[in-house]
């Protein structure tokens, strides 16, 4: 009941300066602000070069939400700029979640947000951070690729949010599908 009407904004795969340019970023920030979300969740693949990390997160920091901003890294973010992204997110008061959980509390109730570290490295990250959680809690799993949800047990997860597929489920500023999940069109 405490979270009745709770609004989540979710963005992923911005690929800033490749798919998303400066005008598009400013439009996105305005759109996010207008949504008046309670929390902003981000699914990774933020940039196309380390020099774009600071301006990207500086712009996203203009989106103020009562319960904060959380993000996981995408495959591009592990390939380059990982530490820059983590440090810049923290600098702007955002919380990177790499196989970690955090709890949103309101009037004695809670929502748990669990974030997955590099979902492509199942040897190191093949145990979901949700397994240790209580099935009584409402848990949001934040992961870069939806394939992780099929490849690994994500017990105790009530809602999973992922990006990566660029599958056109939601087109932002006319960007068309580019990469599909190996599970096809199963994910929306």
Spell out what each predicted region is.
Residues 1-4, 90, 104-107, 133, ...:
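Binuclear metal-dependent phosphoesterase catalytic core
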Residues 3-97:
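Membrane-embedded segments
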Residues 6-8, 39, 111, 138-140, ...:
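Structural motif
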Residues 15, 46-47, 76-77, 101-102, ...:
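Catalytic metal-binding/acid-base residues of hydrolase active sites
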Residues 15-21, 45-49, 116-121, 137-139, ...:
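Short, flexible loop segments at the rims of nucleotide/cofactor-binding pockets, characterized by
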Residues 27, 54, 98-99, 123-128, ...:
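N-terminal post-signal-peptidase region of extra-cytosolic proteins
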Residues 61, 146-188:
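Conserved beta-sheet core of the metallophosphoesterase superfamily
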Residues 87-94, 98, 106-143, 149-151, ...:
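Binuclear metal-dependent hydrolase catalytic cores centered on His/Asp/Glu-rich metal-binding motifs
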